[in-house]
């Protein structure tokens, strides 16, 4: 790694990302987040790193992208480390007022994330999402396990496909929920893990709320 030298590393085992993640420490005792991905993902990870720079420039509270490159283990990125507690653990311990404030701030931050410019040549949202619906329905019909009265749900979806027409598309975080947030020691909310980012309907970025 060109500009940084680490004297200690601690693996991070939380999360579903396929990246190997470490909290690393330099000689001055400063902590960083180190992510390592397979070498064949170079182009995708390079683009992801550049998009993170764009997002950080908006003032989004997040792990700031610092360095990107290739190492013996694959493709690496170094980001600033957020001292604090995972939001999944911290938020249930807060007062209702403080929880509400975190939710409001999360929405405010997401609105900023959605302000990142999108490519002009994006496929229409209705085309993209209808294709996804069709695939899910095909898999459901091929599954030997069926819900009682499951056809009611299928009919409802088919009857409302027109709502997908003419929808705006924005830059999406892609995995926006408490598991990818952190409450810093300064009490502020920070956003983590942009490795599932995408473009699409702004409401789709709220899908992970069902996991919270």
Residue ranges and their predicted role:
Residues 169-171, 184-212:
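Active-site Asp-x-Gly
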Residues 179-181:
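Hydrophobic residue at the +6 position relative to the catalytic HRD Asp in the kinase catalytic loop
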């Amino acid at each position: 790694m060109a500009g940084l030298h680490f004297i200690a590393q601690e693996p991070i085992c939380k999360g579903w990302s396929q990246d190997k993640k470490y909290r690393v420490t330099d000689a001055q005792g400063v902590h960083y987040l180190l992510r390592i991905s397979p070498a064949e993902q170079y182009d995708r990870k390079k683009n992801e790193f550049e998009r993170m720079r764009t997002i950080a420039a908006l003032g989004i509270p997040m792990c700031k992208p610092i360095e990107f490159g290739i190492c013996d283990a694959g493709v690496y990125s170094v980001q600033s480390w957020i001292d604090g507690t995972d939001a999944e653990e911290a938020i249930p311990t807060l007062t209702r007022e403080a929880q509400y404030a975190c939710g409001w701030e999360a929405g405010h931050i997401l609105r900023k994330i959605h302000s990142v410019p999108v490519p002009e040549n994006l496929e229409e949202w209705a085309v993209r999402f209808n294709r996804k619906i069709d695939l899910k329905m095909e898999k459901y019909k091929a599954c030997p396990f069926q819900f009682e009265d499951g056809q009611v749900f299928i009919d409802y979806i088919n009857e409302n496909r027109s709502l997908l027409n003419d929808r705006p598309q924005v830059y999406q975080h892609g995995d926006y929920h408490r598991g990818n947030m952190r409450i810093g020691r300064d009490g502020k909310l920070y956003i983590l893990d942009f490795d599932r980012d995408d473009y699409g309907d702004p409401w789709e970025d709220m899908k992970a709320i069902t996991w919270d």
